[in-house]
């Protein structure tokens, strides 16, 4: 199986829009190819999502006081045949379902406390890390449970070979802002998801005076940089929460505090994306689709 996640947003004039659904469609094709499933044309994927948002328009909420309520869409494809054994699917089911959702942070944005996972890996090079499939998320659950028992909100995974290179959280991409104005994020090397929110942030970064940099990030470099103030702001990003500030890292028994846990630049990036999605700012890149 493979799946996607995107949202339908109601604007002030009552119109309903999707944010970069073509990017989700392209990633859906990539995921299908990796798992030997039939590929659905991007246009058909987008039309299905637009059609559901139109049919279920009464379920697309007003933004509300938080300014973040929306209809979450879940397109998915599963093997659908009577067969017992190992083999690629000859019959599949593609469907899109939706559910109204509120703000990810009901009582305001709160910084995350991350458990640094140096042993268990979420994915490995040559595996399915770039595909959006359930197995990747299932592989993160044991570490998520461990994180909760340690009082953490989420897990920061490193690579499966050297156990040192930062990859991503259980369901979000990772980014850090350096004091000299670089927006640093792990490079795409086949083990992390090609996040649409990640891509969008990298594209708007220059508008905020930031230099986007995709490269390998050593976990010890990050933690040392957080301690010294070299990385004063750190955050995670994804469709559900958009941008989530990170306040601290728990590495073994050592806690490392972020200098600016809800930093000005992090929150400005978050506001920029939300304003585009909800029509409060001009969409000069043509990201919205109705």
Positions of predicted regions on the chain:
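Glycine- and Gly-Pro-enriched alpha-helical subdomains that act as flexible
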Residues: 162-190
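Feature captures the catalytic cores and cofactor-binding loops of soluble hydro-lyases/lyases
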Residues: 195-200
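Conserved alpha/beta cores of soluble small-molecule-handling proteins
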Residues: 1-154, 161-165, 203-290
């Amino acid at each position: 199986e493979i799946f996607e996640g995107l949202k339908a947003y109601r604007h002030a004039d009552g119109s309903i829009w999707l944010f970069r659904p073509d990017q989700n469609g392209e990633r859906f094709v990539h995921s299908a190819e990796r798992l030997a499933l039939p590929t659905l044309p991007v246009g058909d994927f987008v039309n299905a999502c637009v059609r559901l948002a139109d049919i279920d328009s009464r379920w697309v909420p007003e933004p509300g006081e938080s300014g973040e309520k929306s209809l979450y869409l879940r397109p998915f494809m599963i093997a659908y045949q009577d067969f017992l054994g190992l083999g690629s699917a000859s019959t599949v089911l593609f469907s899109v379902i939706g559910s109204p959702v509120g703000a990810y942070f009901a009582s305001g944005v709160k910084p995350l406390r991350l458990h640094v996972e140096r042993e268990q890996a979420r994915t490995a090079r040559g595996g399915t890390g770039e595909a959006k499939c359930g197995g990747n998320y299932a592989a993160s659950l044991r570490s998520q449970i461990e994180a909760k028992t340690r009082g953490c909100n989420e897990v920061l995974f490193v690579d499966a070979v050297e156990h040192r290179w930062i990859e991503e959280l259980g369901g979000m991409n990772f980014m850090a802002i350096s004091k000299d104005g670089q927006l640093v994020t792990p490079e795409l090397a086949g083990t992390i998801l090609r996040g649409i929110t990640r891509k969008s942030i990298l594209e708007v970064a220059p508008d905020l005076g930031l230099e986007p940099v995709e490269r390998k990030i050593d976990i010890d470099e990050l933690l040392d940089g957080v301690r010294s103030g070299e990385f004063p702001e750190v955050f995670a990003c994804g469709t559900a929460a958009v941008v989530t500030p990170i306040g601290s890292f728990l590495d073994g028994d050592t806690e490392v505090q972020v200098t600016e846990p809800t930093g000005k630049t992090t929150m400005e990036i978050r506001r920029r994306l939300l304003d585009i999605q909800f029509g409060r700012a001009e969409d000069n890149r043509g990201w919205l689709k109705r």
